[in-house]
């Protein structure tokens, strides 16, 4: 996808952008996995998209933007900017960018979208597509969160999701499929955040792609997310 932003750019981000533009997502939820988890082959699940927006921090480290959902919402955990696809959205990229604009005031023109990765199917049959974009000019972004949806906006180093630090896990099960739910603790100033479950899983996958190495712990993801076994993810 062509770059929309001009001027001097971080070479680290340029290199990452070029590499990610070549990424080809593997096949997602296969028919056998659908049948195993009670999802009809002809099902047309609801669709959503999230934005993995990457920028370079002051120390030269990659950072990804996250939000703490408003306490007014039924789910007020940490999440990536994003939401459900609307009728007027042309594609998943537009959904992710529109939602990021609405939720945190991120101007779509600031984001260079480079790729999408394999979709995830939630247990509620919602297909979630992670869209990866580069924010070359971090100074041009002044977060203006929608108070009805977002309590705060913060950023973390994606590499933390490959490390066995400030992490714990709990075994969960759904329809006979046992898997691990991962919890990552992060401190930003005086605020503490817990990144877990679905959001953590997406960020583990993103970090694996970015740094081209597996996490330092057993991931054991649920099969129903996208039908790709852990042993095969390591080959991608």
Regions picked out by a protein language model, each given a short descriptive name:
Residues 1-80, 84-142, 159, 174-236:
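N-terminal leader/linker segments that precede catalytic domains of diphosphate-processing enzymes
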Residues 138-167:
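Acidic, glycine-rich loop-and-strand cores that form catalytic or ligand-binding grooves
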Residues 169, 173:
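Non-catalytic RNA-recognition surface used by pseudouridine synthases
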């Amino acid at each position: 996808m062509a770059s929309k932003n001009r001027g001097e750019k971080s070479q680290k981000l340029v290199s990452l952008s070029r590499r990610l533009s070549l990424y080809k997502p593997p096949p997602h939820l296969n028919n056998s996995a659908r049948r195993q988890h009670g999802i009809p082959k002809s099902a047309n699940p609801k669709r959503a998209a999230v934005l993995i927006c990457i920028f370079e921090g002051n120390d030269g480290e990659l950072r990804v933007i996250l939000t703490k959902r408003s306490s007014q919402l039924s789910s007020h955990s940490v999440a990536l900017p994003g939401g459900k696809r609307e009728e007027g959205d042309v594609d998943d990229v537009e959904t992710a960018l529109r939602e990021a604009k609405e939720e945190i005031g991120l101007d779509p023109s600031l984001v260079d979208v480079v790729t999408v990765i394999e979709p995830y199917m939630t247990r509620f049959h919602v297909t979630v597509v992670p869209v990866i974009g580069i924010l070359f000019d971090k100074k041009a972004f002044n977060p203006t969160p929608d108070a009805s949806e977002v309590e705060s906006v913060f950023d973390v180093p994606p590499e933390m999701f490959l490390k066995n630090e400030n992490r714990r896990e709990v075994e969960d099960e759904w329809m006979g499929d046992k898997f691990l739910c991962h919890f990552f603790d992060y401190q930003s100033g005086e605020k503490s955040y817990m990144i877990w479950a679905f959001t953590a899983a997406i960020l583990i996958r993103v970090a694996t792609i970015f740094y081209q190495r597996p996490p330092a712990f057993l991931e054991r993801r649920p099969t129903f997310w996208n039908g790709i076994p852990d042993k095969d993810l390591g080959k991608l």
